[in-house]
């Protein structure tokens, strides 16, 4: 079949399918584009001539559209993707951050950046990087460290092996992440006689591999000698759809479950054995129980520093680790005994073996008491008001900063109370999306849901700017559900271009913008380690040349209304509830500009986070923070 490389690529993508548990579905939904000279007349021509069943989407920012695609794949539990194409140079470079985000989170993302000429005839072409020591280097080489597979198509016939390997990685639960196929702009238009069998329908089967028997037997020996195990429910539980199996396992042996950010909403928040979020952004209940656990069973988790509290959370000297993970790389962390396979079938097999040996944990009332303590704390958090009895959750180091914000904006809302109102007002099956700032911590601790896959948090790369784009991605994946972006003013200012794409696609998204005039959580981290506030609040430069002037007020509702969104500006809890109710009635996208008081987010609960504090300073507070870091480090695992 004689066709161009671009045409062959489109035809190939249109014939890719996945099969999971007997259900077959199309894998590639479409292609996001921001056309430039390096892609529009090659791949662009192919998409115009015959896109097949692929939808062509128009992005507004290359990073933004790639975040949309990442969220789309995540919300589809990695079984459907939207590819992303860009021009050469800056357009391609804009997708590098999104590639890293997808790879860290093990989410399939196919990137198709245009590239310099393979022939080099017009070098240096517009937007080309030139390196005197290697003429073969282009901007697209920057994708290599952040992708799970990378290739450059210098000849049309190379497309075939490249795309087969791309699909291998994209559909492999253990290896998936970003894939970059760089497309030199001249090669895109080159014609070649491709064999017809390259375009046959391909069904990529996502299987449920079962670990070898020896791994189960060794795990059985460990568990039988443990009295107080805990389970950590990671993202692998979600993608394997193993939530019910995990709950059955926990109920059978009375083992409490703690959640990572990626694992939240895989099981019901209301379940008596679900303690909620664990670690640095975890809650009181989970961290209390984790401290004394003698066994940690990690299911589908990477054991990030936030989950393990920089490897200091599990204080029982007899603690051991078992991991159930489809990835051997992640399975070997923490010196864990590994069970390498699919979460669902491996948990079921392990349960059968433990039942045959009559295993049961020795918990009595510890789980109930821990949940009761957290319930009381939740009640306190959701009822914090800015009144005569107000006390900030984060002790302000800058005197008068809360009052200054309130006077300037009129805002009277505490962040934890706002989350309480949001949870009680929006639909039970609504999807909430987040990524960065103080909101992921508050949400992992406070957000409760019994609806599967309704919590969508990117906390592997914690990429500012993911939130709004990802909200559109989740909406494209599940158009019948309301989707809410939980975004701070810092992340909003970083990237919100795909609001326009949402308007274009006529897909309603809801943006809940928490404005506290700064990078609030980093200001907390900065000042809690003895440093004064420096470039973490949004302040004017003062007469002394420092960023110490007044706070910069921004009317975000007014800005968003210019894009065509229905907007609300709220300064009290009553206004917030009214806006949320009205937003549910709207057919267009909405933005609620919530003026939340600084220092009213949650703090940590018996968890430590290892950050690189200065080992020598003229500031007493920094020196004390360093001493505290060294003390905690001595109590933590070394690896």
Swiss-Prot record:
Catalytic activity annotation: 3D-3,5/4-trihydroxycyclohexane-1,2-dione + H2O = 5-deoxy-D-glucuronate + H(+)
GO MF, any single term: acetolactate synthase activity
GO cellular component: acetolactate synthase complex
Protein keywords: Hydrolase, Magnesium, Metal-binding, NAD, Thiamine pyrophosphate
Domain of life per record: Bacteria
EC assignment: 3.7.1.22
Cofactor note: Binds 1 Mg(2+) ion per subunit.
InterPro entries with a match to the protein in the record: DHS-like_NAD/FAD-binding_dom, Myo_inos_IolD, THcHDO_hydrolase_firmi, THDP-binding, Thiamin_PyroP_enz_cen_dom, Thiamin_PyroP_enz_TPP-bd_dom, TPP-bd_CS, TPP_enz
Pfam family of the protein (one): TPP_enzyme_M
Record-listed Mg(2+) binding positions: 489, 516
Main EC class the enzyme belongs to: hydrolase
Job of this protein: Involved in the cleavage of the C1-C2 bond of 3D-(3,5/4)-trihydroxycyclohexane-1,2-dione (THcHDO) to yield 5-deoxy-glucuronate (5DG).
Family listed: Belongs to the TPP enzyme family.
Protein name, entry field: 3D-(3,5/4)-trihydroxycyclohexane-1,2-dione hydrolase
The species this protein was found in: Clostridium perfringens (strain ATCC 13124 / DSM 756 / JCM 1290 / NCIMB 6125 / NCTC 8237 / Type A)
């Amino acid at each position: 079949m004689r066709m161009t490389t671009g045409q062959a690529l489109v035809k190939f993508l249109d014939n890719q399918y996945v099969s999971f548990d007997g259900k077959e579905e199309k894998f590639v939904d479409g292609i996001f584009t921001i056309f430039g000279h390096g892609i529009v007349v090659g791949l662009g021509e192919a998409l115009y001539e015959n896109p097949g069943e692929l939808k062509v989407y128009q992005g507004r920012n290359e990073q933004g559209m790639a975040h949309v695609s990442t969220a789309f794949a995540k919300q589809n539990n990695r079984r459907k993707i939207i590819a992303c194409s860009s021009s050469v140079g800056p357009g391609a470079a804009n997708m590098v951050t999104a590639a890293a985000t997808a790879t860290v989170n093990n989410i399939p993302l196919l990137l198709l950046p245009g590239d310099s000429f393979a022939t080099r005839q017009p070098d240096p072409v517009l937007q080309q990087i030139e390196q005197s020591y290697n003429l073969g280097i282009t901007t697209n080489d920057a994708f290599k460290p952040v992708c799970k597979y990378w290739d450059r198509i210098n000849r049309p016939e190379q497309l075939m092996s490249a795309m087969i390997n791309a699909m291998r990685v994209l559909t492999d639960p253990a290896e998936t992440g970003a894939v970059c196929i760089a497309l030199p702009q001249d090669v895109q238009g080159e014609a070649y006689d491709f064999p017809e069998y390259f375009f046959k329908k391909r069904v990529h089967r996502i299987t449920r591999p079962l670990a070898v028997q020896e791994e189960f037997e060794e795990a059985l020996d460990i568990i039988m000698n443990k009295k107080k195990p805990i389970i950590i429910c990671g993202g692998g539980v979600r993608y394997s759809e193993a939530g019910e199996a995990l709950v059955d396992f926990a109920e059978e042996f009375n083992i409490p479950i703690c959640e990572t950010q990626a694992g939240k909403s895989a099981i019901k928040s209301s379940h008596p054995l679900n303690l909620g979020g664990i670690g640095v952004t975890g809650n009181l209940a989970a961290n209390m129980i984790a401290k004394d656990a003698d066994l940690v069973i990690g299911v589908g988790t990477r054991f990030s520093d936030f989950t393990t509290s920089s490897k200091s959370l599990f204080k029982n000297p007899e603690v051991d680790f078992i991991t159930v993970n489809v990835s051997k790389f992640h399975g070997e962390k923490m010196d864990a005994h590994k069970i390498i396979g699919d979460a669902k079938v491996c948990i079921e097999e392990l349960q059968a073996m433990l039942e045959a040996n009559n295993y049961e944990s020795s918990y009595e009332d510890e789980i109930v008491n821990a949940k009761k303590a957290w319930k009381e704390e939740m009640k306190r958090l959701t009822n914090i008001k800015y009144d005569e009895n107000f006390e900030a959750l984060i002790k302000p180091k800058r005197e008068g900063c809360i009052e200054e914000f309130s006077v300037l904006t009129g805002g009277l809302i505490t962040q934890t109370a706002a989350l309480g109102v949001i949870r009680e007002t929006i639909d039970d099956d609504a999807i909430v999306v987040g990524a960065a700032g103080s909101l992921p911590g508050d949400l992992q601790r406070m957000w409760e849901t019994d609806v599967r896959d309704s919590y969508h948090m990117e906390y592997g790369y914690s990429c500012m700017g993911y939130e709004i784009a990802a909200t559109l991605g989740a909406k494209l994946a599940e158009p019948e559900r309301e989707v809410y972006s939980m975004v701070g003013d810092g992340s909003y200012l970083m990237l919100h271009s795909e609001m326009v794409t949402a308007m274009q696609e006529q897909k309603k998204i809801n943006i809940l913008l928490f404005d506290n005039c700064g990078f609030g959580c980093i200001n907390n981290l900065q000042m809690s380690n003895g440093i004064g506030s420096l470039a973490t609040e949004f302040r004017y430069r003062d007469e002394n040349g420092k960023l110490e002037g007044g706070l910069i007020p921004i009317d975000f509702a007014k800005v968003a209304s210019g894009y065509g969104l229905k907007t609300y500006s709220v300064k009290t809890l009553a206004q917030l509830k009214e806006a949320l109710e009205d937003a549910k009635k709207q057919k267009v996208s909405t933005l609620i500009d919530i003026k939340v008081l600084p220092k009213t987010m949650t703090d940590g609960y018996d968890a430590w986070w290892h950050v690189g504090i200065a080992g020598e300073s003229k500031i007493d507070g920094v020196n004390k923070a360093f001493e505290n870091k060294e003390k905690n480090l001595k109590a933590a695992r070394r690896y």
